[in-house]
Amino acid sequence: MVDYKNKSLKELLAFEIAQIDDIDIRDFVNETLEVVEPCHAWKPASSTGKYHPKFASGEGGLIRHIKVVTRNIIELIRATPAVENEKEELIAAAILHDMWKYPKDRDHEFTAFDHPALGGDYCKSHGQETIGRLIAAHQGIWVTSKVLPGHVNEAPKKFDEWLCHYADLLASRPYYSCDFDENGELIL
């Protein structure tokens, strides 16, 4: 069993990070994982448990969700030659897309509805425009919420934004099922 509280985000997502060939983008992902809240390692993907499958709940649920989203985006890239030139950014966005669900300045009981905007802004402010744009639009059509009146997340407009959204959407369906080994790696 994986001890999510005693492993870094970089350790837990090492396989996914290794799928990024571009050293600058890989470094950006690693550096980002060092500055976001460490609790992302052990928190669930959904603080209420309503919006994700069983594998994404409980301790380490968000990490398992990110592993599936990353696998989904890799498969979507393989099936879509038109985005091969954005492979690095799409994989980075899949890894980082939910790393602002539990932001530093907020209570960690519930996930932050504006996490796409927080993540997008962070990436853009660090020179990663494409990754930021992909993260900002990853929630798809769910752009407003009663929990944060007045805030509107970006909706996908470009094809690559839709792919990033679909990778996340599919991994969050309650009927989605997959297995993980004793090291927390996705079993194919």
Where on the chain are the PLM-derived regions?
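Acidic/His-rich, divalent-metal-binding segments that scaffold phosphate/diphosphate chemistry
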Residues: M1-D107
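Short intrinsically disordered terminal tails
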Residues: M1-V2, E185-L188
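Histidine-centered active-site/metal-ligand motif
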Residues: H65, H97, H115-P116, G120, ...
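Hydrophobic side chains within alpha-helical segments
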Residues: V68, K101, L118-G119, A171
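An active-site-proximal "capping" alpha-helix that borders the catalytic cofactor pocket
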Residues: V69-I73, F113-H126
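Histidine/acidic-rich helix-loop-helix segments that form or flank divalent-metal centers
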Residues: L90, C123-K124, Q128-E185
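Metal-dependent catalytic cores of enzymes that make or break cyclic nucleotides
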Residues: R106-T111, L148, V152
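Short, conserved loop/turn and helix-capping segments at secondary-structure boundaries
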Residues: F110-D114, K157
